[in-house]
Amino acid sequence: DYDWSLRGPPKCATYGQKCRTWSPPNCCWNLRCKAFRCRPR
């Protein structure tokens, strides 16, 4: 399952780029720059 959150810094990866890692661990911004995706290891 994916945990979505609107919290986080306004940093986005450009289209086709890998997501930037951020806290909480294993989270990154999605390419749509609307939220970051938290995924278990």
Swiss-Prot record:
Gene Ontology biological process terms, A to Z: defense response to bacterium; defense response to fungus; killing of cells of another organism
Disulfide bonds: C12-C28, C19-C33, C27-C38
UniProtKB keywords: Antibiotic, Antimicrobial, Cytolysis, Disulfide bond, Fungicide, Hemolysis, Knottin, Secreted
Principal subcellular localization: secreted
Tissues where this protein is expressed: Granular hemocytes, small secretory granules.
Domain of life, per lineage: Eukaryota
Record localization: Secreted
GO CC annotation, single: extracellular region
Free-text comment on this protein's domains from its UniProt entry: The presence of a 'disulfide through disulfide knot' structurally defines this protein as a knottin.
Function summary: Binds to chitin. Shows strong activity against E.coli (IC(50) is 1.2 ug/ml). Is also very active against S.aureus (IC(50) is 0.8 ug/ml), C.albicans (IC(50) is 0.9 ug/ml) and P.pastoris (IC(50) is 0.3 ug/ml). Binds to chitin (5.2 uM are required to obtain 50% of binding). Causes hemolysis on sheep erythrocytes, probably by forming ion-permeable pores.
Name this polypeptide is given: Tachystatin-C
